[in-house]
């Protein structure tokens, strides 16, 4: 993708406004999980070491615009960031009128969502943000699918708008996986409902060699193949759609395989007994919570042979260990594969962490909704803006 990269610019002495995704969970006023903060560090360090005057933007939570809420303040993030960087990172509360920052220093601007007009991509607000800087850096892939003042509007009016290293790496990895994938290409799409992932399923069914479905989504496909699903979560009104998707995959030389065995339980709880059954032996009281060992082995074989793997969603209720074997086996097969693998989505990343796979997956996306929209083939507003500015 043709965008200007921050790493190609001379930043010395420049006022550099960087939009990161520092929307992290807090517990008792402290950062509970700093994964997103750590992901942003290479970008921030590069700007500081280049002698830039760095201003950082992010949202946190969902406060009501125009009503600053102490519970959504970025102060704990500023304190945590200061520790990681080994230098002071002041929090600027009233930053829209200007920020005092020296070369090689960073200031974190208070929650962008405290400003009226942020979510609506208000032009006047975007222009005030743009007036703060010489260079605007969009580095928050996780919010690239939202056209908001701090992710889109500001970039339209800043003197220079570019992609930060984290965003550039995301686009490169996703481009490699989707635009010219090494074959065979395999995708895993898990989740509770077909309806929430319908666009992804439709797009991928035309592209991939194998589209493996998991979770509640798989139950709808199991029903579409004519098997009983008992009391399992599934969408009866989308059974015909599931059949269509299977036909589409076949017409494009691919397949959406259906499990031959499953793991069932009688209730959704951590201590319910797990029972392996053939897919045609599920009874009226059963709930399907995972793929069975035979199916897991078959799918794992596909992973090991794949040239490209896209993973979005677990294949079972992996939060309960007795229903996590399918996800674990597929995750380990992806980690062992010589193919290029990309994983994204909150539950997927949680599974990657649980089974200790992080350093063996080629790329782990920081985006949830943005990752999904990219898989759907949609244009991300922030990326479209950067492309337009690159051709100014």
Swiss-Prot record:
> Which residues does the annotation say bind substrate?
21-23, 36, 59-62, 113, 146
Gene Ontology terms describing biological process: gluconeogenesis; glycolytic process
Asked whether the keyword Zinc is assigned, the reply is no
Q: Where in the cell is it found?
A: Cytoplasm
Q: Name one GO cellular component term.
A: cytosol
What this protein catalyses is: (2R)-3-phosphoglycerate + ATP = (2R)-3-phospho-glyceroyl phosphate + ADP
* Pathway(s) served: Carbohydrate degradation; glycolysis; pyruvate from D-glyceraldehyde 3-phosphate: step 2/5
Sequence positions that bind ATP:
197, 319, 345-348
Print the keywords alphabetically.
ATP-binding, Cytoplasm, Glycolysis, Kinase, Nucleotide-binding, Transferase
One GO term in the molecular function aspect is: ADP binding
Question: InterPro entries given for it?
Answer: Phosphoglycerate_kinase, Phosphoglycerate_kinase_CS, Phosphoglycerate_kinase_N, Phosphoglycerate_kinase_sf
Task: Decide whether keyword Nucleotide-binding is in the record.
Answer: yes
User: What domain of life is recorded for the organism?
Assistant: Bacteria
Q: How does it assemble?
A: Monomer.
Which family is it part of? Belongs to the phosphoglycerate kinase family.
Read off the PANTHER family from this record.
PHOSPHOGLYCERATE KINASE (PTHR11406), PHOSPHOGLYCERATE KINASE 1, CHLOROPLASTIC-RELATED (PTHR11406:SF23)
Q: What is this protein called?
A: Phosphoglycerate kinase
Q: Which organism is it from?
A: Alkalilimnicola ehrlichii (strain ATCC BAA-1101 / DSM 17681 / MLHE-1)
């Amino acid at each position: 993708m043709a965008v200007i990269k921050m790493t190609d610019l001379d930043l010395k002495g420049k006022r550099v406004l960087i939009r990161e995704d520092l929307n992290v969970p807090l517990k008792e006023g402290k950062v509970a999980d700093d994964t997103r903060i750590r992901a942003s560090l290479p970008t921030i360090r590069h700007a500081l070491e280049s002698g830039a005057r760095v201003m950082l933007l992010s949202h946190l939570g969902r406060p009501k615009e125009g009503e600053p809420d102490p519970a959504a303040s970025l102060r704990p993030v500023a304190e945590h960031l200061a520790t990681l960087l080994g230098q002071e990172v002041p929090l600027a509360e009233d930053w829209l009128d200007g920020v005092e920052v020296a070369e090689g220093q960073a200031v974190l601007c208070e929650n962008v969502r405290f400003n009226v007009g942020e979510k609506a991509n208000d032009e006047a607000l975007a222009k005030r943000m743009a007036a703060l800087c010489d260079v605007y850096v969009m580095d928050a892939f996780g919010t690239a699918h939202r056209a908001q003042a701090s992710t889109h509007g500001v970039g339209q009016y800043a003197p220079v708008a570019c992609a930060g290293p984290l965003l550039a790496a995301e686009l490169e990895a996703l481009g490699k996986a989707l635009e010219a994938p090494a074959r065979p290409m395999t995708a895993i799409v898990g989740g509770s409902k077909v309806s929430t992932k319908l666009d992804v399923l439709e797009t991928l069914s035309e592209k991939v060699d194998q589209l493996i479905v998991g979770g509640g989504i798989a139950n709808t496909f199991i029903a579409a193949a004519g098997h009983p699903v008992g009391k399992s979560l599934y969408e009866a009104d989308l059974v015909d759609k599931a059949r269509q998707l299977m036909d589409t995959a076949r017409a494009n030389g691919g397949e959406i395989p259906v499990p031959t065995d499953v793991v069932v339980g009688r209730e959704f709880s951590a201590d319910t007994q797990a029972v392996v059954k053939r897919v045609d032996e599920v009874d009226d009281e059963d709930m399907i919570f995972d793929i069975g060992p035979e199916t897991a082995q078959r799918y794992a074989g596909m992973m090991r042979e794949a040239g490209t793997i896209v993973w979005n969603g677990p294949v079972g209720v992996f939060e309960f260990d007795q229903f996590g074997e399918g996800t674990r086996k597929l995750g380990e097969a992806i980690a062992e594969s010589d193919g290029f693998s990309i994983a994204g989505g909150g539950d997927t990343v949680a599974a990657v962490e649980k089974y200790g796979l992080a350093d063996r997956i080629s790329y782990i996306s920081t985006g949830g909704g943005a990752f999904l929209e990219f898989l759907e083939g949609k244009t991300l507003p922030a990326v479209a803006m950067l492309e337009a500015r690159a051709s100014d």
